[in-house]
Design a protein with these regions (language model features):
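Conserved small/polar residues in nucleotide/adenosyl-binding loops
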Residues: 343-349
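Active-site-adjacent scaffolding segments
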Residues: 21-25, 29-133, 137
């Protein structure tokens, strides 16, 4: 068997070949993902698969291990995937994001007024849509930065392989000021993404969603939005139900790949999280993939690539959960995932959960 790694537009393809045929494979998608306001380079793993007749022989594990080695060599800071239960923890991945759904009854959404014009999104709108998304998500952890010059549009709806279509809201000068992304299916009315910032935009988008739900003859519509999203807050006036799911060792999972590079890139975010009256403290951290020490020099937060024995100890999975705001330092301590050598140490926490 031969392992091949091929650079593709936007990422990598890794295949295990036998007799000239791919028998196990995956893709790595290049992305820039925010931790707070700071982008880090991530590899999104997708399409992990082995031919049915050859499963349970460790082939997928070989491909996954090759992917992690490649990402470390190529300077990726972290990696994320949507995992099946009880498999990807073997490669250091941990569940680190919740899954959100907001549901509104169609009859209530019909009360929203149309204040702006709407039309189907066009390729010429992609630059503006990317800019709206980046503006709306500027401090939202786990959102991906979209390059307005290169972003090619929405690859899918609310899930992998789900077809999609987008509508845009226009102001009085016919400029795109908001958008909504639908699952392009007839079985449900699902909204995968919403962009925009004014009440007029939100009214218009909800009106458009209600029209689609009526056309599909669905009693309710659902949105893939966290409860603190501005549009989710707007929808409270119409009555809605929020559902948040936390998977066990499955679902949205991630891991750090290059610890020091990642921490260096997010120093401005860690400085933002650090309480002003704690700046005299030094934060030393020891993990299974490396150590680091954070300290203030004047008004600047610095990192050293080592840590003394007297340090906070946690593995990279727990650190991933902490950086993404999935768990707090206190919850990690309670679960024996974080050992703190001295009681007054305070780890900066994510305020953007």
């Amino acid at each position: 068997m031969t392992l091949r790694q091929e650079k593709m537009p936007g990422g990598w393809a890794i295949d295990l070949f036998r007799d000239g045929r791919s028998i196990s494979r995956l893709w790595i998608a290049d992305r820039q993902m925010r931790i707070g306001s700071q982008p880090v380079k991530i590899g999104g793993i997708a399409g992990v698969g082995t031919d049915p007749a050859l499963r349970n022989k460790g082939l997928a594990s070989r491909v996954m291990e090759a992917a992690l080695e490649l990402m470390k060599r190529e300077g990726y800071d972290a990696s994320f995937l949507y995992g099946i239960p009880d498999f990807y923890h073997r490669f250091g991945f941990t569940t680190c994001m919740p899954q959100h759904s907001l549901e509104i009854e169609t009859r209530r959404a019909e009360c929203a007024q149309k204040m702006l014009k709407m039309r189907t999104a066009q390729k010429a709108d992609y630059t503006t849509i990317a800019r709206i998304y980046n503006r709306d998500s500027a401090r939202r952890t786990a959102s991906c930065w979209r390059d307005p010059k290169r972003w090619y549009g929405f690859p899918m709806g609310s899930g992998f392989g789900v077809p999609c279509k987008a509508h845009v809201a226009l102001d009085h000068r016919d400029r795109v000021v908001g958008y909504v992304l639908y699952d392009d299916v007839d079985t449900h009315c699902r909204i995968a993404e919403v962009g925009g910032q004014s009440r007029a935009i939100f009214h218009t988008l909800l009106h458009d969603m209600a029209r689609r739900a009526v056309r599909l003859r669905r009693p309710s519509l659902s949105l893939s939005l966290p409860p603190d999203h501005p549009f989710a807050l707007f929808c409270r006036d119409y009555g809605c139900t929020d559902h948040t799911a936390y998977e066990r060792n499955a679902g949205p999972m991630g891991r750090l790949v290059n610890l020091h590079n990642c921490i260096e890139k997010i120093l401005p975010e860690l400085a933002h999280r650090w309480r002003l009256f704690d700046r005299e403290q030094v934060l030393a951290v020891r993990t299974d993939i490396g150590h680091f020490t954070l300290s203030w020099q004047g008004d600047t937060l610095h990192m050293e690539r080592d840590a003394p024995r007297l340090a906070a100890r946690l593995d990279q999975r727990a650190l991933t959960e902490l950086l993404l705001g999935y768990k707090t330092a206190n919850s990690l301590k309670t679960n024996d995932q974080l050992a703190v050598s001295y009681t007054h140490l305070t780890l900066p926490t994510n305020r953007e959960v």
